[in-house]
Structure formats: C-alpha cells, structure tokens
C-alpha cells in the first residue's frame, strides 16, 4: 500500500478529471480464460463505491466494490495475459484489477494507453482514500452508500422516484412487517413536495429515518435524560461512566461527541445530544463491541517467540482446492497484509533450472520461486514490522536448492541477517520485538555432527513436506506416444467431479470418509483406465516428468483415527512397479527412513526454526526446533499428552497443518491445538468459513499484527485443558449478555427466493469458544416476521475459566420450520469485549447489527482461597495427588477399557457409559420459542471415539462425562441422594481439592488407605455390584439421613465393608467405626452424624450386594468410602468433577457473601442477586442438566461437584485448625441438608460463626452455587457459650430448616476436645451453613419467600428450574426405580429393625416417636419428600433422619449440648415453605406425570389426594397437634417442632417474626413449550383428582407442609404408577397394614411386582379414603413443568 501514498496527494483537478471519465464510462475488452475478449462498457457509479459494467446477463453480479479491490497492476502481469500471444495486445493498454477473498482478477484492455492510465490512477486514488479513512468515516460512508443503493434498487422503473407500491416491495425486502396502513401514513408524512404520491431520494431518507427510529435507544436516552428528549453534556458523561464503563470521561470529550454526531444545528448550539445524534453515536465505532484500543498492538512483545500464537497459512500460494486450483504469487501479498506471519512455500524442481512453487503430485499450476520471494519481500512488512516465518518445504535437487538459497539471500538481503538479534537468556528464542523487520527461514538443517566444511548432507524427509499421502499422489507415467496433455485432460475431468462430490460433506467435518473413499476410488479408476489405454512397454525406465501411477496403500483406519503416511522407500521404482505391494502397505518397522540431500547454503539460512520430523513430542534440548504435525497426529498427541505437549510448547514452536485429505482446502478446528499451546496452526486462508472466522477473530486483537500472547498459565507451569476446572486457583469471568434488539438483518444469503423470500424469523445464538469446559452456546427466542428491528430483550449468562483464549461468537439465524438458515455472524475475542451498551455489526454486512448490553464480572470459584490464603496450598497439593487415583477409580466404572486404564491421562475423553445411555431420558428438542440449554461445543475434529471430560455430545449439549447417571428414585430427596450417594469417596474427596478435609491429620491414614484399597481387586468386584445396587443404594440413601457429602471412610466402611456387620448390629458398627482412634477422622464422625448415619443406613441397603465382599473391605474403610458411594456417588463425583466445567457460576465475591450473611433480615439487598447470581445458578444447573437424566439430582450433584464439596474444603480450613482432627465430626456432610441442598437456607443464615469460618471459603463457596433444587443443610449452631447473636442467627437458620434433622444440635457428635469450637461448629449446622453458602448462592431470598408462595418465571438459562416457595421439594423426574431398589429397601428396613433390636439409642429418637414403630421408615420416608409434585416438605425427612441420626449417636459419647444453641423461634420463613423444584427436563411423550405438577399453596396445604393420605398420617397429625412428648432438651423440642407433622404450628412460629414484605420473590423455572393438549389433559386430570381428594380429606388435618400427590385410582396391582418409575412410600408412625399407601411400580417393570414382602408400607389399596375435613381448603395452583 506504500505506492498508494502517492495518489493521496494528487491535485484535485486531476482527481476530478479521472472521476468524470470513469463515471461516464469507457469501452474496454474484458479477457476471460479460454474465451475471446468481450467488449463491455465499464463505469464508476455515482457514489464512487463500485465499478460496474454492462451489458451483463447478471446485472446484480456485474460490479466490484472499491472496498474489495486488493490491487491494480499495469501491463500484462496476470496469468490470463501470459496465456495470450506476445503481440496480441499493447502492454501499456493492459491492466488487471485483483479483488475479493480469492484474489479473482479482472483483466482489461483499453483502446489507448491514456485511458488505461486514467483508470489506474483513479482506482488507486479511491483505494488510497479508503485505506486512509478512519473507522467512523468509513461507517458513515458505508451507511450513506447503503441508503443510496437501497433507493436505487427499490426504484424499479428507474424514474428516480419511489411510489407506494415500490415502497411496499422495499419493506418486504428489508424484512419489515408493518401494516400497510402504517406504511402509507409514514409515506404521506415524508412526501412533502408538490409531486404527491412519490418520494424523491431526500424524502426517502426522511421516510427511512421514521421507519428506523430506535425505540430501544430512545428509552435509554430518556432514562439518562430525566425524561427529556436529549442528553446534556453532564448527562452524557454520566451515561458514559455508568453504563459504558469509560474512565477519564471529560466534558470536552462529551462536547466532541455532540459536535461529531448531533444532526440538529440547534442542539449543537445548546450543547445537547438529541435522539438522532445519540443513535449515530451508539452506532458508531465508539460503541462497537470490539475494544478500539485493541486495533493497536497492546500486548508485551518482548517475550520469546514460543510464548505467542502466530497467524499461519497453509499452502499459501493456492487460490482454491488442493488438486486443481491456480497458484498465485498475489496470495502471498494478500495473506501478509491480512496479518498472517507464517507462509508456506512448496519448492520443486522446475524447467530451466528454475525452482517452482506448486502443490506436488497434483494438477495445481506452477509459479516461479523467484516471483514468490519478491512478492514476500515487497509485502511482508507493509502492515506491521513483526517477523515473518518462511516455511520452506524443499523437494528440490541440490542444484536447485542452491538456486533457492541464492534467491533468498539476493532478494531478502539484510532481512535474513539475524546476527544482531538479541536472544536474551541463553537457550531461549528471541522475541518478536527483537526480530522486527526480519524474515526467518523454517526448513531442514544439516545435523551438527557434520563438519562445517561439508557442502551437503542427508536429512530426514518425513515431515509435512510430503503432505499428500501416497494414496492421493498422481505419479503420472506417460510414454509411448501418450502426451501429458491427454493424461492431464482425462485426470482433470475426473478430479473435477471428485471435488464436486467432496462438496457434499460439511466443510468443517473433521473426518471425511466420503472424500477418502472418493479419492481412492478415483485413483483406482484412473489407474485402471491408464493401464488399458497406455501401453507401458518401458516400465523399467525411470519416468521423466509427471507420471500417473497412483500408489494405493491400504489405508488402515485405526480406532484412534491415526493415519500414518505410507512413504515409499528409497528405491521408489519398486513401489511404482508394484503398486499395492511395498508402495502402499503400512509396514512401519520394515521400511527404511526416508532421507533427502540438503545443501549447506540452504541449511545455513535456518537459524531459529529448524523443521523436525515428529511422530511424537521429542524434546532433545536444542532451542529452535519446530515440530510439524498433521492435524490427525496432533489430535492424538493433544488427547493423550496434552500437559506434556503444553510443556514442550513453552520452549519450542509447533506447527500443525491440515490433513492431506482436505482436498477441497477445508479447514480443521484450530482450538484444540491453541488450547495445548501450539503456536503455528496453519489454515487454508483461501477458504472462507467458520474456522477462518475464528482465526481472524483471534488475531484481530493486538493490532492484527499476527502475534497474540499466550496466557501466562500456558507459558509457565501446566494444566490439563480438558479438566472440568483447569485453573482452580484463578478467578473466572462471568459474561452477562443481554441481547436487546437487531437492526436491518437481511434475508439469508442463500435464500432460494432472494429478496422476494419470506420475512425472516430471526434469533440470536451466542457461542463461547475456548477451553472445552468453556465451550457452550445459548440462544434467544425467535421473533416472528421481523428482520428490520426485532426485539429479544433476553439475558444469556456464561462462565469462562480462561478468558484470555476464549472467543465469543454471535450468530443470527432465520428460524425455519425445517431447520434454520444462517444470516450472519461476528466473532470477537473475549478480552476485546467492551462492557456497556454495544452494537455487534455482523461481518460482511453493511448495516446489519445486534444491540446488546455486556456485563463482565470476576467470580471466584471454590479454589480462589488458594490465592488469598496460602495455607490452602497444602490442601491443594494433597488433594491434587489423589487426582489420578480418582481417575483410575472412575475408570473402574467405565465400560470402555481403554479409558478405564488410563489413569494418567485424566483428560482422556470418555464416552458415555452404557448406564448413561440407558438411564438418560428422552429429551425433546427445544421448540421454536424455547431457549436451548447451553450447548457444548466440541470442535475437536477427530474426536469421535473418545471425547474429553469436557466433551460434549455430538448434538452439542454440554456433556459432563457423568458416570452413568445414578438413578435417584423420585421418592428420595435429592439431598439424600446427594449426600448419600454423593458422599465422595475418600480419595475423591481427596482429589477434590475441595475435599480438603482429607488434610485433617486424622484423615491422612484413611486417605492413604483409600488409595491403596482403591486398587484392591475386591474393589472392582464391589463396584460391579455397586453398579447394580447403586440404584438401590440411592433409594436407600433417600431414606438415610442426609448423608455426609464426604463419604466417611468409616461411614463407608460402615456402609460397605461393614454392611455385613451392620446388619446384625449397627450400634456395634458405629462403635467399631469410631472407637479406634486411628480411624477417627472427621469422616468417621460422620458415622455418628446424621449424615453419617444416613450413610451407614445405606450400608444396610447395600449389605446384600456387598456381603460377600465385606471381609475384604473390613480393613479398608477408606476404600469403602470411595466404593460405598457406590457407583452413584462415583458417578456423582464424576459429575462433580466434570460438571464444574460448563456451568455458569454466579459472580459472587466474598464480600457479597459476607454481606448477605451478615444481615439476614435485610434480604432485599440480595434482590439483585436474583437477577444475576441466582439465575446464573439456576442456569448452571440447567446447563448440564438438560442432557443429563434431567434429574435434579444430576443438577445438584453437578453443583455439588462443582463445589467439589466446598463445604468440605471449608471445613478443612477450620478443622485443620482444630487440635484433634479426629474429633471434628465432619459435618461437611451436612452439606447434605443445607449445604448441599439448598444452601439458600444456609445462605440466609449468616452468623458470626460463619464469619469465623474462613471468609475465604465463603467466597469460594459462593461461586459454586447450588441450583434451587436442594435445600441446604442445617445451619450452624454455635455452642451455648457463643455470642448470643450467633445463637439467634443460628436459630433462625434452624427455624428455616424445619425439615432438617440435622438442625438439631443434639444430633451432632461432639468433639472430644471441649475447646474446639470450630470443629464443632463445622460439625454443627453452622458448618453446613458455610458450606451451604457455597453451593447455595442460589438465592438467599428464595428461602425466605415461603409465605408468599409465589411463582416467578426466570429468564435466562434457568429454564428448567422452578422455585416455588411453599415447601421443599426435590426430585429427579428421570430417576427410575428398579425392582432391585425395592428389594433392597426392604432389606434395609429389615436391617434397621435389627439395629433397633440391637440397641439403637431409643431415647434419641424424635420425641414424636413418629418413626419408632417404623424400622423401614427411612426407606420410605423420603419418598414423599421427593415428590416435588406433591410438594412434600422436608419435615418427614427430617424426622426420619433425626431419628436415624441419633440412632448411631449413643455410640459416641455426646458432649452436653454445649454447641447447640437453645432453639428459639426463627425470624425467617420456614424452610419447609421453601419449594425448590429441580430442573426438569424436556420430556418425551410418555414422561409427563403428575409429579410434573408443582403445587403452590397459599397457606397450609391439605392433601390433594386421598391415595397418598393414610390413616397413619391423619392420626399422627392429630396426635402431633394435641400431644407432644417431653423433649429431651430445648433443642430437641425445637427439632420436634420442625419435623413434626404439625407444620401449621411450626410454620406459624417460624414465620411469625418474618415480615412478609421482606421476602424476595422466588424464582421459577421457565416452562418449556410442549403440546398444549397434553398440558390441558394433565391439568384436568390433576384437577379431578384434587376435587375427589378434597371431599374425602375435608376433615383431615395433615401437617401443613406435606402435600400428598393424588393419583388416579388404579387396579390393585398397579398402585401409584409413575412414568418416572419412582414409587411413593410414606414414613408413617403407625404401621397399619391397610392404612399405608402402596408403592408405585417402576415404569416398565416386568410384572406387577408383589412387593409386599417385608415392606410395611406395601398395600394393594391404592386409594385410601380420608375422612372429610372441616377445615377450609387453601387454593391450589399447579405449575406444569414440562
């Protein structure tokens, strides 16, 4: 462009003369390939923006935009001119215009040299003006041009006026859907001249402004102008500071804006900005989404080359496909000016001793090497000075190699001189800054062992030099009269058809077998044809020139998709004569290494970039090696050795090039290689498409200089890019993107009917591209029939772990009943996004844009405390050491043997296990208006059989490689399942760095054991069993107390290893677990804790399966802890591990948490959270859920996992302080109730206790919000001596958690040491509180809002979560209950009974004795709870839990309730009232059940259905109201209130002090769109059941919080059938055979399943009559979650 400078300074007279000649038009001859010249009239349009010609059959295409002209050359320089005979044309009358992405040439011949000179001068002047204008001027110019062009195109009759009919047609073209009356009204307002009925251009501009008034911008202006129609200077400054987040805003700057953008002179005088000026400003580059500062180089350019991504081109000389296209030197000029810094030159021997450049063994055209070097020399540093790497692929003889070296030195001269370059530290590559203006030659270098005097030597030739594999080579043997022309013409026809067929496949398809098959078939056909037609008599002679004998190797497809090249040996003749024998076979071992001769002159030009052949990562310690990998080989390396690869890339350069099978020049996905730190990822710049758009976006930042600094984490240290939380210690970024509106979105470019097509129905999709864990996408709803100014007003939220390498891609689609059509896109690096109100202009479209509001928050995940609290690093280290073991452990459950064994490759991508597939519910695709859940975007090209942990399904849904998703019976509360099933295996906990509990001293032994046992053969067997029993387990877990989130080794041991023992005597078990001091880790305490107890109970359930293995496990409790989790827990943990990946965490900082926690009553302050944090939380859940079984459990688990048991971590930090680690009962488990479940509750309760716990943890916790699906654990209970306020707060929390058995301090085992508050606290609910906070961040407000029981719709991704306020419900609709579970639960009942007989501590049972008579209570109690639809409250659960929790306690002496606060009425809404439906999946037709009807009741709830109300319940509720047992202590009394059926009382008491107005409204899941008829049908059935139930249940006073779901009367056998396969069992105090409700049969059960055996809840009567109730019925609302 340097030569254009001259034209900027032309005299105005000369410029005008040129312009007038060009606009009036000139007759010229247009040369085309293969035809005679065509005479055409060429002219410049009146706006001087297009060169046009006529006549033309396609007038629309007969134009070239001045903007698209790349260069204009004089004389006969183009290839087409070269094909013409010398004397045909006068060179001074010839010139060529190069334009477009593919450098198409327009070759013109004028009648005289003067005309040619005029056109060349005029065109270069226009190009100079364009290159010189700033972005604002360009935007204004293009806008004006667009309006003028629009007017001209609408003027069909060419009279310069538009009538009303032409306006209507224009409206349709512009995708405006306005009533004709409205259009006519605007038309009349704009038509002001005497010529009524038509609009001139000026009138059309007025009309267009009316039509395009931006309502969204107008409202924005009003909001900052105090309802005026203009902004003053001060108001504008305020807007820029507050909304646009601009710093250093001065009044002068604001005045400049007014002067520059305001249209009205009157406003300029007043120094105010009106709506037109404001619109102009908002549409200007100043408010573009891309940071204007990044148009310049802003990064540190003094680091070694290996610390940068470098823009690289593959086969730069080609203009099209790899087989037939033209090679052009201009392509080098083009890509260098686009910012590419590494170009490729394939050198081959040419005629006359002149090396040529082309793609070997193909029919691409040849260009001279000398011309290429001259072009590179001329254009290398036009746009920037940073170094250019010349990748020489040398296939030449020694003589021509010397010629190459000669040209390089002679033409490039001092650009090759690197002697002055400062390399800085020894053995380090120089920096881009120190190499400015230099050209590096990348090529082979002679080995060092050769003396300096050696003129030549041999080097390996096995690298990308010979990219085309033998199967694709054309070695054309022609002889005996067959001419080259004959052969080429035949082949060309075949290849053209081949290329056409190859277009069938998606260009981005990484692994096109279609093309491979076509290639082979074509080659074989060609070979056969030539054999028939060519009498090859002299087969022994060497062929001269090109020969066509294709070498067809058997291309073996490895499972890993690795393809090794089939190189021929040194004696190539043999392979040519025996095609299919040596030439083609892959005989790696037997073949000789291919070598080539290299001359010293060329070798000496290679300094820092020595090409090394590589089948693997080889670091020989020398600086300056560049490894070259084909994309397929690189893919394997990235998958198998990502961390090793990253370390290599910290010292050396790596180049990745496209597979030889990409004959159509398609591009692979560069992301996986960038993520592994590869610097030179070479793409085909001539091929437009998604991958080049991503590449362009990546390098556009930093001034488009071709060098982008890698993140520091990639330059030092290492991390696993496939991990679910690759950088645990680093804060993440949260992107909150509000998509407001669109402007002038055109019809799809490939629209069949063009402008006459239908008005589009646009929607916006936003995709995050980066690390696998960050890759996801979300979309807005569809706006029908409006492409001109659609309004979406939707917020999308994303969490990004490594923002430095992430890109944000905005896509606009036209929704179509049978798919969607691409309208436009824009891709921007995350780091270049600017916050505030921004326009995103779509690439390549003049006016089309979308208007968004961007907020970027920094959020701290569970690991951020590492930064703030160095003591965490030890925990981190200890946890990390278990990471690999855990991977191995997970592998045991993975049916894919290859992955299971790869413990060290933790990042290996896993396929979903069979269990996953079986348990996965059918999920319908989102309907048109419905938001899709975040979709995972795994672009890894070759990943087909193995997908990384962050891997996603092909369908795009973010897939956290969850182990087979555990089925939680719907009848089991999620938290139970979570807690029980979730308890991490010890090692897992260990692995979870969060499970820092491991760090407790007492725990270390266990951890060691865990590791050892993990490898125990028993374990694998055990796991197998577990897999079968896991469902049962889960089931049982449902009944267990909230099991600890950390599986207690003991617990587990108790559960698993000891299952046998426990069976006879749980008490003993507990003792065993707890007595030996050396095993007494906090986890063991769990055994006593409610949570622990739950685990142990689970044990009972498992005993049958595990019995035979019990002996093996007795000593290996820790192991058990892992195993006990059972597959479910493992899976859970998997979920956890991988889950954290894609979810959008809320941005919640420590301060936020403390603030929230510190002031409980004032929840309004947290209201803001609802919109963002909470919805994000919800989104988080939704995000992974959508493709998991759809169960809330999965979501919760995910959340849990995300937090990786932050609770545990938290605990650790405190526990670690305690003297006796063993003593700290790991209440982390408490995560079970609140912490895990709803930390919301815990959230609410902040107490100093909490604050005492490390605040850091809180922060971290905060980010791992748990979706609203679960209620948190009990809140912390300080010891009596603690600050009263603490107590109060604690109580508050407890009050809120009526359902949590754990709320009762009495249940917490005491630490041996009296003074260890913290341990105790941790044990106590307080601990959970904090823990809870982490998972909870969901929405403090939510928990409070019980009284209002309002349903709110949540925007954003939370579509699947519904939060109802009234009562706590959790469910996993997708959970199926298998007969096995039923059986096991019965067994559990039996165990419990035995345990009771063997001395369970009765005095600890709940005062209400609700469960005294029901050994199996736990088994069934939870069922109610789980039925979200029924709205079961936690109370049942808590009671059963409480009892069970206490059952184990006697074994461990309980300190007096010193840590337990005295219960007092809570000031908060009862948690019981908190209804947290879990995210529900999109259900397939048979899946919708009554459980999908969420009930919201205003006040006490009565039973909806008699079928779920039993006499036991009635009696119990009556007795509970009339009589209460004497509490053992105040806390127990409080607990009794919380868990008793007397919900009415407890609700009143708890809520009495809570101001209704203080309760923020709860969030509710958005309903997905489903068939209306189904919805109506379900609603009507529910209503009928409700009516029927009302009459019978009139007199019944059931506890207020329990809503029993009604079921239609059914035959005796099919009691309470649910499509989810869950069964409902009640935990009733009285075991009246007839009065108990029956369990439903699992969906698809083979038989009716007489499950009465040992099942005290079993009853064949599905419909239980209830007596009429005199009490008033509350109004019932049903929320159909579809």
Swiss-Prot record:
Biased composition range(s): Basic and acidic residues: 992-1018, 1581-1590
SUPFAM superfamilies, alphabetized: C2 domain (Calcium/lipid-binding domain, CaLB), EF-hand, PH domain-like, PLC-like phosphodiesterases
Lineage: Eukaryota, Metazoa, Chordata, Craniata, Vertebrata
All residue ranges annotated as the PI-PLC X-box domain in the record: 299-444
Binding site for substrate: 442, 444, 628, 655
Location in the cell: Cytoplasm; Membrane
Stretches that traverse the bilayer: none
Biological process per Gene Ontology, one example term: intracellular signal transduction
Chain ranges of the PH domain: 20-128
Biased composition (Polar residues): 1040-1050, 1065-1074
Binding site for Ca(2+) 4: 814-816
Cofactor list: Ca(2+)
EC number(s) per entry: 3.1.4.11
Bias kind Basic residues: ranges: 553-564
Protein name: 1-phosphatidylinositol 4,5-bisphosphate phosphodiesterase eta-1
Catalysed transformations (reactions): a 1,2-diacyl-sn-glycero-3-phospho-(1D-myo-inositol-4,5-bisphosphate) + H2O = 1D-myo-inositol 1,4,5-trisphosphate + a 1,2-diacyl-sn-glycerol + H(+)
Single annotated GO MF: calcium ion binding
